[in-house]
Amino acid sequence: MATPHIRAYRGKRIHMIGIGGSSMSGLAQMLLAQGYRLTGSDNLETYATRGLRDMGVPVTIGHCAENVHGAELVIYTVAILPDNPERVEAERLGLPTLERATLLGQLMEGSPVAIGVCGTHGKTSTTSMLAQALVVAGADPTVHIGGSLDFIGGSTRVGAGRVFLTEACEFNASFLHLRPTVAVVTNIDEDHLDFYHDIDDIQDAFRRFLKLLPKEGHAVGNGDDPRVTALLQELDCHTVTFGMGVCCDWRPVNLTYDARGCASFDASRHGKTLGHVTLRVGGFFHVYNALAAVACAWTQNADIEKVCEALSQFEGAHRRFERTGEIDGVQLYHDYGHNPAEMRNVLSVAKLQPHNRLWAVMQPHTYSRVKRLFQDYLTCTRDADITLVTDIYAAREKDPGDIKAIQLVEGMRANGLTAVHTPTFDDTEDYLRKHWQPGDLVLTMGCGNINQLNDQMNEHERAKEAGPM
């Protein structure tokens, strides 16, 4: 069966399996804005499913065959396995189906400027920064982010300008379904090792993505990452680099940090200062993200002073070192980081915040990732005073039986860390409430559902304050 095209289904019922996902919920909003009729399903009720329901989309919680009855097109993500009852029923009925990344590529078609932000780390933050910068600079872009940005009111924005900006995710090589005219590469590192064989395989996927660029296009890459620069040298299109190195096109000059780790710097191109940035989000990695946004905006002839002003107002994306509340004088934060390098980076920022003791609550994500990066996990929370480790979040995988969270805890202890296995959210909350002290800071980390622990603790606190009914 030929791949269906979304444009052929305007006015027809489209069903989205996994509609509550960060990307899928945004794409649903984009389709709604363009007049498409939608239904959806997800296995969890979340703010995303509730929000879509408020917009008029019938969303069913739980997957069953009946959900696709009456649909004329079914959209799914790679996280929805072939044995999902809705996918099975769609196939039985002969319904055309479309994978999420293919849909995104189709929605980008026809945009004069199609920007894809890729990289192992920093995609969402960089895309969010660039979105805010382009809006402030007057580009009126259409935006698709794999997270939520208050500045645009969520994960998507439908604009009337020439620019379509999206995250370009390397998992399952899904970014190869896109047709970018501009690509931003934040970095290339080991991840998604359930799909890729090794780092060379990962780098080759990025190579194939960059080679989708037209000759008149632009590749904007991290000039301090040798894997990125090696790929840039292979391209026929225009290339722009950013970073700390003296050979980078865009560099931060007069770089300083405040007590919370927030950077201030002049954005300099080939030695000429074109704007000043004072970030409100902490971490050296955000200097790279901001420079990437500046360099990319420059390729579109944006007013760099306005771009820098926008970056100076950037408050961060949801689930990126996001403060979620305070209980008993304890500050609660959450971060999406799930790779050891990301956890290490965000803990370096958390350590700079005022606190008594720093708690790291880690939800390891997928058995394959834990197995391949096991040694890195054992020391990545060294900046924390205490590490709590929940059971591994399986996501799309089945338990192979040979890797458990307790093995991480034992390895951390062997490396001198104070670590405790708290298998469930209830176990974790109980341990925290028994042992935390006023002035402590708790940071939950992971890209699974660990953010729901923060919600759970806040809900329990509100119920306690309300008293018996």
Give the positions of each predicted feature.
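Conserved hydrophobic helix-helix packing surfaces used for dimerization/oligomerization
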Residues: 14-16, 74, 115, 141, ...
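Structural beta-sheet core signal
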Residues: 16, 40, 143, 183, ...
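Phosphate-binding loop of NTP-binding sites
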Residues: 5-7, 30-33, 53, 67, ...
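Nucleotide phosphate-binding/pyrophosphate-handling subdomain across enzymes
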Residues: 3-15, 23, 27-34, 111, ...
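C-terminal helical cap/extension that packs against the catalytic core
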Residues: 378-438
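Short internal beta-strands
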Residues: 36-43, 219-223, 359-363, 384-394
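Beta-strand->loop->alpha-helix junctions that form or flank phosphate-binding loops
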Residues: 41-42, 60-63, 98-105, 144-147, ...
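N-terminal leader/targeting and accessory segments in enzymes
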Residues: 1-103, 226, 248, 282, ...
